[in-house]
Amino acid sequence: MILAVDAMGGDHAPRAIVEGVVQFLAERPTEQIEIRLVGDELKLRSYDIKDPRVKIVHAASVITGEDEPVRAIRRKKDSSLVVAANLVKSNEADALISAGNTGALMTAGLFVIGRIEGIDRPALAPTFPTRNGKGVVILDVGANPDAKAEHLLDYAIMGSVYAEQVRGIKQPKVALLNIGSEAGKGNALTKETYPLLETAPIHFVGNVEAREAMSGEVDVIVTEGFAGNTLLKSTEGAASMIMGVMKEQFMSSFSSKIAALILKPKLKKMKQLLAYEEYGGAGLFGIAAPVIKAHGSSNAYAFSRALVQAEQMVEQQVVTKIIEAKKTKEI
């Protein structure tokens, strides 16, 4: 297995990326996994990586967060992201992982690697934390804000395959994000999508409201990119606010500091439950090879989890199984 890594994408690149790669490989010292670390060769060699499974591939430029995605992919052919994507396209690597520009990664996936035949629109699918610790896959969170019912059906199938094959959930429960739990609720899109999901080769359990998204009652939630991105950003904001308020209150007096000390193990567990680092990155489903978008602010540990996610997608042949499930839907 060979993983192509964009070493220059992300807020803390290339250090966090390199350290994440080293950590990932150290956890599997005997496995035949190779990393193609793509980026500025001079900078990458300065980290003196000892593991022979890491091969540096030089790329002269970087696509930044300020670059317009389509223009950047077309003009910066020598960028770390485009070079890494071309390794996957030419079958020199099995998966692509980047913490860089999300729009550019989606564009590279679509126009360099290519789509799965029959999947019209890809979906960005992170795993959200849940109260029971299982996590829930939500797609789409921004790749396609103007989806049709047929696209949501594809998302449901892809999310179900991923939840079963990578997250190890037998017969994952799939729900449709809506403003109410009743079948007749919602707008024209959700009303058109609901009967399609009922007859799909998945375990569809009906609608779910946003307030129940992180309850752990369902394993996959399907929505269009606008609502999904709004849910993602509001959830991140709420979690940050809650943790911030708790920290302020616990540090506000001597007695509250004592209480914090007593509760430290529980608070640590709560922080771990809400931490994005534990869930890897967001899969870009619908692309002809595994593509993982690591969080832009990923530290070494978070990036190593994104590599684990890519490894599992390759091992479990998720793309092949999505293609098979898509054919089942069409029969």
UniProtKB/Swiss-Prot annotation:
Role: Catalyzes the reversible formation of acyl-phosphate (acyl-PO(4)) from acyl-[acyl-carrier-protein] (acyl-ACP). This enzyme utilizes acyl-ACP as fatty acyl donor, but not acyl-CoA.
Protein name: Phosphate acyltransferase
GO biological process, one term: fatty acid biosynthetic process
The family this protein is said to belong to: Belongs to the PlsX family.
Subunit and interaction comment: Homodimer. Probably interacts with PlsY.
Naturally occurring in which organism (per UniProt): Exiguobacterium sibiricum (strain DSM 17290 / CCUG 55495 / CIP 109462 / JCM 13490 / 255-15)
InterPro entries according to UniProt: FA_synthesis, Phospholipid_synth_PlsX-like
Reactions that this protein is recorded to catalyse: a fatty acyl-[ACP] + phosphate = an acyl phosphate + holo-[ACP]
Keywords: Cytoplasm, Lipid biosynthesis, Lipid metabolism, Phospholipid biosynthesis, Phospholipid metabolism, Transferase
SUPFAM superfamilies, alphabetized: Isocitrate/Isopropylmalate dehydrogenase-like (SSF53659)
Pathway: Lipid metabolism; phospholipid metabolism
One of the Pfam families matching this protein, by short name: FA_synthesis
Gene3D superfamilies per the UniProt record, alphabetical: Isopropylmalate Dehydrogenase (3.40.718.10)
GO molecular function, one term: phosphate:acyl-[acyl carrier protein] acyltransferase activity
Location(s) in or outside the cell: Cytoplasm
GO CC aspect terms: cytoplasm
EC identifiers of the protein: 2.3.1.274
